[in-house]
Curated annotation (Swiss-Prot):
Interacts with host IRF7. Interacts with host RPS6KA1. Interacts with host RAB11FIP5; this interaction results in the lysosomal degradation of ORF45 and the inhibition of viral particle release. Interacts with host p53/TP53; this interaction down-regulates p53/TP53 signaling pathway. Interacts with the N-terminal part of host NLRP1; relieving autoinhibition of the NLRP1 inflammasome. It comes from Human herpesvirus 8 type P (isolate GK18). Phosphorylated on Ser-41 and Ser-162 by host IKBKE and TBK1. GO terms for biological process: symbiont-mediated perturbation of host innate immune response; symbiont-mediated suppression of host cytoplasmic pattern recognition receptor signaling pathway via inhibition of IRF7 activity. It is found in: Virion tegument; Host cytoplasm; Host nucleus; Host Golgi apparatus. Prevents the establishment of cellular antiviral state by blocking virus-induced phosphorylation and activation of host interferon regulatory factor 7/IRF7, a transcription factor critical for the induction of interferons alpha and beta. Mechanistically, ORF45 competes with the associated IRF7 and inhibits its phosphorylation by IKBKE or TBK1 by acting as an alternative substrate. Residues 128-139 have a biased composition (Basic residues). Disulfide bonds: none annotated. This is Protein ORF45.
Length: 407
């Protein structure tokens, strides 16, 4: 078995690198072909067949290589054998027992081991090697654990008293600091519409506690959706199925009339007339629109027109029958002026059909539950909702009206 420890180099490369005559040239590295004779006699370390060269080509080194080290060169396999001085100084066990052991092992040492080498010198050092890690194919591996638990309403008072923190709806705050009473959460009450589906409105008690109404130094009143409290507004009835384009006082009751205003709230309880019984109720549905509530809307930033902008929002309700369809339409009319607040009119389209068994609207959960019943005049902008529905396309985005939960 040959061991090469030299780096081959070409003479042509050296001539190109050192063209000056008389310059010191690097000596070619000396190679270590075979181990010393004691090791070469071991099986596997002998000379190959046909080799007649020297056994060892010595690598000469200058004298100052080991000057800073110990006087002797580094330890080699020859230095690991026990010297006679060390063996003579050892008297840990009896000499008679040592002689008996030597006599028994003389034959074995003569066959397997050369002179001066211990028997286990070339044995595999399996006991000195580090063991590989045990395979954990199906065992759980440790992971980082973060201490924490879900707090309930019963143990927050006891546990947070020692921590000095108070839990709120949106996180934790230091103890002693609690949100003011004005920053409450709006209570949403279900508004029982004619179809009985999920239309919600603000109760009169929760209008003053709508979040965002209080001025904050970190918020811009002109940015984001409006959450200002709703205000009372007039109510009127307009028949969209009518062919007349003029505002006929006979078709729509007077807005300033309290009796007509009360009838407009409960128009869904009116039984169908005798004339409607004669018509085909499966194809023609008599639709009546009640303008229920008007809310204040935030000032628009657009300066495209100095007049008012009318915005229409529609929400489709699930069909309770094939012939009865109801939807909620919010008509928002705003102004760019600061003096006159903008208004939003809610329109409910509720078909009346004798075949469709739809839930009726109770007076307690009618539109009056979110309206204070004021009878102020509506103004000329909302006088003709049919023109608003026909001329103004529906717009997208939040902030166009103050009921974002209808999206």
């Amino acid at each position: 078995m040959a061991m090469f420890v030299r780096t081959s180099s070409s003479t042509h490369d050296e001539e190109r690198m050192l063209p000056i005559e008389g310059a010191p040239r690097r000596r070619p590295p000396v190679k270590f072909i075979f181990p010393p004779p004691p090791l070469s006699s071991l099986p596997g370390f002998g000379r190959p067949r046909g080799y007649a060269g020297p056994t060892v080509i010595d690598m000469s080194a200058p004298d100052d290589v080991f000057a800073e080290d110990t006087p002797s060169p580094p330890a080699t396999p020859l230095d690991l054998q026990i010297s006679p001085d060390q063996s003579s100084g050892e008297s840990e066990y009896d000499e008679d027992e040592e002689d008996e052991d030597e006599e028994e092992n003389d034959d074995v040492q003569e066959e397997d081991e050369p002179e001066g080498y211990p028997a286990d010198f070339f044995q595999p050092l399996s006991h000195l090697r580090p063991r590989p890690l045990a395979r954990r194919a199906h065992t759980p591996k440790p992971v980082a654990v973060v201490a924490g638990r879900v707090r309930s309403s019963t143990d927050t008072a006891e546990s947070e008293a020692s921590m000095g923190w108070v839990s709120q709806d949106d996180g934790f705050s230091p103890a002693g600091l609690s949100p003011s009473d004005d920053e409450g959460v709006a209570i949403l009450e279900p508004m029982a519409a004619y179809t009985g589906t999920g239309a919600y409105g603000l109760s009169p008690a929760s209008r003053n506690s709508v979040p965002g109404t209080q001025s904050s130094p970190y918020s811009d009143p002109d940015e984001g959706p409006s959450w200002r409290p709703l205000r009372a507004a007039p109510t009127a009835i307009v028949d969209l199925t009518s062919d007349s384009d003029s505002d006929d006082s006979s078709n729509s009751p007077d807005v300033n009339n309290e009796a007509a205003f009360t009838d407009a709230r409960h128009f869904s309880h009116q039984p169908p007339s005798s004339e409607e019984d004669g018509e085909d109720q499966g194809e023609v549905l008599s639709q009546r629109i009640g303008l229920m509530d008007v809310g204040q809307k935030r000032k628009r930033q657009s300066t495209a027109s100095s007049g008012s902008e009318d915005v229409v929002r529609c929400q489709r309700q699930p069909n309770l029958s094939r012939k009865a369809v109801a939807s909620v339409i919010i008509i928002s009319s705003g102004s760019d002026t600061d003096e006159e607040p903008s208004s939003a009119v809610s329109v409910i389209v509720s078909p009346s059909s004798t075949k469709g068994h739809l839930p009726t609207q109770s007076p307690s959960t009618s539109a009056h539950s979110i309206s204070s019943g004021s009878t102020t005049t509506a103004g000329s902008r909302c006088s003709d909702p049919t023109r608003i529905l026909a001329s103004t396309p529906p717009l997208c985005g939040n902030g166009a009206y103050n009921w974002p939960w209808l999206d």
